[in-house]
Structures are given as structure tokens and as C-alpha cells.
Amino acid sequence: MAAAHIERHIPESTITLIESPTIPIIGVGESSLPQLRNFFNELGIDDDTWVSECNGLIKNGNEKVSWNGGDDRFKFTFWYDANGLDDWLDDYQKYNLPKESLNDKFYSDKGWQGYAYHLDAELIPTLLKKYTERTTHIIDTIEELPKGYDLYLDCTGFKRKFVRDRNFIDLTSRGHIVNKAWVQSFKLNEKPYNYTESVALDYGWQFNIDTREKRGCGYVFASQFCTTDQALKYFQEYNSDYEPYQGSEPRLLEWTSGFLDNPWQGNIVALGLTSGFIEPLESNALYMIQYSITNLVKTIKRNYNPQSYNKVMKKLWLHNSDFLLHLYKLSPRNDTDFWRYYQKDNTDLTLWQNYIKHNNKWISLYPSSMWANVAVLYDEFSKKSQYTTV
């Protein structure tokens, strides 16, 4: 992604990409946000091309299951008509409408970017190679940086082999306690689902991401409340109706939620998982990669300093963190120690502060429409008048 974008926007650049033949791709299937469309469109890749070549599907949103307790289901969509919210809210409160009626007035396919994608993570690099004609591609595993380059992009993941400043902002104390995931691909037993499904479970949640041939699943959990073996047992039981795709086996992913305070230090820039990771919820990881690349190119072209890049990235990481935490903290679930952990904070006020702040004033990862989705999911509109006057 970085090589293709830099080629496109800094045509005078000379790029060498060194790819290890022994380090596999982490993804089990990727769910994206609508902003990814702009990234690929700028490269000249239309929907039909990359959806077909990446085994992809159009994604219309995210369905939350059991976050509100029981079998409650609610679909977050990307369509947004700002003028429809107040009208819908009046009817919702007067006539006790179902939450799903929000789609009738609040969303518009002419609004906030419309749709996103599901795609096979293993196929994305193959497609992007076609759009990096000037990039020298070397297959090798290196232990030190080659000399003679002006700028190095460290994409070595959690190992962070080459970054100069390892000052890490740990978000665990902020409330990001999910730190492991069992992931596996399964054969589809049914028609592919055009929403990412996020199912709240006892000690975390499971994502289900359908592409045209398979379903990528992962049980994201907090190890302080559930052992790795227990989580594997839960994961296998929950997905017992599905057959592994091409003999796939469960894989364990582990991380510490957080980000580098200074991802650009000297002439080395941390990208992707090297820069940071919070968790898979809300398909945020791929967007953070995308934004770090586009922000880097803008910083270079405007001749800004690395400190300005680092400041913007830190702001986005914290904004990302705020939104994800509200999904946990506003949940009324208290059936396990995991969910009771989040009951100690009252986030009603901060929900509405964020809604107002992002209401068509910021171009951000989660605009006001997404905060409104959270409010509808947890029936926070019944409390709106208490908090929106502050």
C-alpha cells in the first residue's frame, strides 16, 4: 500500500520494497471502512477490479449481536443523512418505534461514503504489485537496514526491528484489555453476508467476515478473565457447525493495545502494526495503515517536520480509542467479570460530547453518524436531554 501510494503521489521517488519470504500475512480476512475506497480509487483501481481480484464483497455496515444483552441485533450502516436524525428521533420517542426504523430517515446512499468492503488479506499484495511498476521488489529477510536511502519505512509488525524511538503508549490502563484472538477461516455454509458481524460473547467478542469463498472468524478476548485454552474451547464450540477452509487450523494472535508515541523518528517511519494496534473492533486497523501512509505523503510534500506527523497520528489513535471504549462501557451486560469490568465508568456524558464534537465539523475516523449509531444501539437517546445542554 505504501509503495503504490508513494509512486502515485511522489513520482520522482525511487522505491525499494524488501519482503521476507518466511513471514506470513497476519490477516484472516479484512473488513474495511468506506475511506478505503478513496485510497484505491486514487491508485486507479476501480471497485470491480479489486473486489474480484481480492475475493471481495461490498460491505454495507456492521451488525452488532448481543452487545445489548440477549439476542439483540442492530446494524450500523455507513449511509448518513444528517437532516433526518431529528425527525426520526421525534417519532422514535413519541411512537416507540423499533431501533431498526432508523434506516428509514437517518441514512441515505448519497451520504457518508455509502459502503466499504470485505476482502481476502492474502490477495491484496498480489493486486497492489500491479500498481508499483517503478518499485524495486526484493525477496529477502534482513537484520539491518541497507545503506543509501533517504527514508525507511519499518513494516516489521510487533517486532519493530528498525524503529529508533520505542516509546510505547500502552492503552491497557485506559480500558483496552482485550489482547488475544483465536482466528480461523471456514467454508461458507450459506450465502455470504454483506455486513461484518460482531458478536458479544462472555469474555470478548467474535468477528465474522465473509468473502465470496470463505468466512474469516476470530474470538477476541481478554486474557485476564479467560485463559488461552478456555478461549480456544469457546471458539471451537461456537463455530462447530463450520468446516475449516482448506484445512485451516486455529491461530493465536497476541498484542498489547497501544501505539508508538513517535512513529517517525530520524529517517525511519513505523507503519502498520509497527506503529501500533488497539484491537480488531470496527475494522480500524486497515484504516490506521491507510491514514498513516496518506499522512506521511502529505507531510513530505508540504515539507512539514516529523513532529507534526507524530502529533496527527497520536490524535487519531486516541480518537480511535475513545470510540472503541464507548462500545464496551455503554453496554448494559454484567453477566461475566469481563463485562462487569466496564461498568465502573459512566460514559453517557462523553458519548454526547463526542457526538457534538464530530457533528459535521471534523473529518474523522468516526463522524457523528457513528456516534449516533452507538446511541441508538444502547438507547442513549432517552438520556440525550440530560447531556446535550452542557
Question: What spans do the regions from the language model cover?
Answer:
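Conserved N-terminal helical subregion
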Residues: 71-144
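Glycine-rich FAD pyrophosphate-binding loop
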Residues: 5-28
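A short, Lys/Arg-enriched amphipathic alpha-helix followed by its capping loop at the start of a domain
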Residues: 2-13, 39-42, 134
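Predominantly flavin-linked oxidoreductase catalytic cores and closely associated redox partners
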Residues: 5, 113-239, 293
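FAD/FMN-dependent oxidoreductases across multiple families
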Residues: 212, 221-326
